[in-house]
């Protein structure tokens, strides 16, 4: 962690999102009929670098933040939201997921596989995959704006907490508290 610099994150996210988009495009454009393996398992396995970078970034941003890291977070919030929207609003990809979901009872899936299929289908539906194109576009805009506002709010809370504190100058003010505190 000590070698990671805030400036590393934006290009790392850019590369990871490009790779993830390529994986998603290959799944969506697969000419074979959708199967659990070529659609759901492939979708679940996609974006590993993106997920790893996201976890590291979000943990650092929440616990060991800095002005540079917060600037990267503000820049990336709408872009990562747009990335998620692009996947969840991909009509060809959703058609594959939806086709499998429609015949899930006949697929002979293990309980974990069925749960993954149902969860992914629900994620697409909640993101607006069934909406008309204009409504999907608007839902995406709202999601990107919410990502920006959520980031701003979280950063404001962190800044507020960093400036808050109680100075105890009289030991009697600690009366009644356990010694471990």
Model-derived features with residue positions:
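Zn2+-dependent metallopeptidase catalytic domains
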Residues: 1-181
């Amino acid at each position: 962690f000590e070698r990671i610099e805030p400036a590393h994150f934006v290009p790392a996210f850019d590369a990871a999102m490009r790779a993830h988009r390529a994986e998603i495009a290959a799944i969506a454009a697969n000419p074979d009929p959708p199967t659990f393996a070529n659609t759901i398992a492939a979708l679940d396995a996609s974006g590993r670098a993106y997920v790893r970078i996201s976890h590291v970034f979000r943990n650092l941003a929440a616990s060991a933040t800095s002005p540079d890291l917060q600037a990267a977070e503000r820049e990336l919030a709408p872009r990562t939201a747009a990335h998620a929207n692009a996947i969840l609003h991909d009509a060809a990809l959703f058609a594959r997921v939806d086709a499998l979901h429609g015949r899930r009872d006949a697929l002979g899936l293990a309980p974990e596989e069925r749960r993954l299929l149902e969860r992914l289908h629900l994620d697409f539906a909640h993101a607006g995959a069934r909406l008309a194109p204009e409504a999907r576009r608007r839902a995406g805009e709202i999601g990107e704006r919410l990502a920006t506002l959520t980031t701003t709010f979280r950063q404001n809370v962190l800044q507020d907490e960093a400036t808050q504190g109680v100075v105890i100058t009289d030991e009697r003010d600690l009366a009644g508290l356990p010694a471990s505190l």
